[in-house]
């Protein structure tokens, strides 16, 4: 944890505010929880109908986490877009009125692609939280850690292991070697960062839906901004970029993201609700259940989860690399703890293949559907920076049989209501029932329809 973050932590603790790594980012919630996938992870414990605590009389015997990398700078192409937009505004605007005054002398110095220091601290804290929750499984075993090959994902996995080991007391810090890094080269079989489904890649539904929703709220913002920046000639497409600068500038300003970017004050809370929903629509119709091939790339990971839950070989004909998964050194079975690290889009297709969003009805392209009315679906609730999903297996004293095993899924500390198995009042399904419900993945879904000719 950075020195600045440590000072903030101590100050909050002295003031009586509970601060733990599991709470996530709590600053500026009226803004930061409405940044779509660019929201920093915040705990959904308070929005869960079921406590995320281990049920009384139960013991966790297995846990697998799937986590997104921490907060980062914009991707290279978007960083170039944002920089160019700000330069154009500074060259063309004849006045910078009111809250836009800072733009006159603002210097764009955001990097590209890599984690910010705040993003690193997110994953360090995540490692601490993972140890605190599952420390009972660490006595005789280590956590097996895999990462997708992007630098920011690998760096996130390293910070997680660093935090985990620090909490365990086994290391004094420093990057720790990962067990496996899987390349993200084009068409490479990689279940934690899947690709290779042409029909999925060629689907244009998300673009059409997001364009439709953007048209419902953006024009009044354009008119207001152009009054504040006469001569800048701001277009509809520029508004999303200006709004995105709010989260990206905030997570880069300080090591603990404790200073809100002045870009945030350019827009109202209601406008950020629309921004959040715009990003949510992009995920739902681009990588989720709104894309008929949305689940297909996630099949391989679900089949890996089945293998780990049952300590049996992986059965998959989609994105799994069997040279890795048939090798006990690179895909060991029978361990109690696993941690995988990936991207937001990859996690969305995996959750979709698992059927987690089966209760979510198609999202409206014309008006906001609140996450509570979408069975908990939104980009900020499911795949924020540093998102974490836990797949737990447990045994309980009150079970009819001492050998009865249960499965429960937590997504950002919310006990996720499983759809394709019989869920009890604690959010659990019997292991066999859970696996039987994963029929889409076990049958390889519609992967055989992925290979299509590119559109002419």
UniProtKB/Swiss-Prot annotation:
Its main location: secreted. Residues 1-24 form the signal peptide. The active site is at residue 69. Keywords: Allergen, Disulfide bond, Glycoprotein, Hydrolase, Secreted, Signal. Disulfide bonds join 58-396, 197-450, 246-264, 421-429. 1D-myo-inositol hexakisphosphate binds at residues 37-38, 68-69, 72, 75, 152, 283, 343-344. GO terms for cellular component: extracellular region. It comes from the Eukaryota. GO terms for molecular function: 3-phytase activity; acid phosphatase activity. Its EC number is 3.1.3.-, 3.1.3.8. It catalyses: 1D-myo-inositol hexakisphosphate + H2O = 1D-myo-inositol 1,2,4,5,6-pentakisphosphate + phosphate; 1D-myo-inositol 1,2,4,5,6-pentakisphosphate + H2O = 1D-myo-inositol 1,2,5,6-tetrakisphosphate + phosphate; 1D-myo-inositol 1,2,5,6-tetrakisphosphate + H2O = 1D-myo-inositol 1,2,6-trisphosphate + phosphate; 1D-myo-inositol 1,2,6-trisphosphate + H2O = 1D-myo-inositol 1,2-bisphosphate + phosphate. Catalyzes the phosphate monoester hydrolysis of phytic acid (myo-inositol hexakisphosphate), which results in the stepwise formation of myo-inositol pentakis-, tetrakis-, tris-, bis-, and monophosphates, as well as the liberation of inorganic phosphate. Myo-inositol 2-monophosphate is the end product. This is Phytase A. It comes from Arthroderma benhamiae (strain ATCC MYA-4681 / CBS 112371) (Trichophyton mentagrophytes).
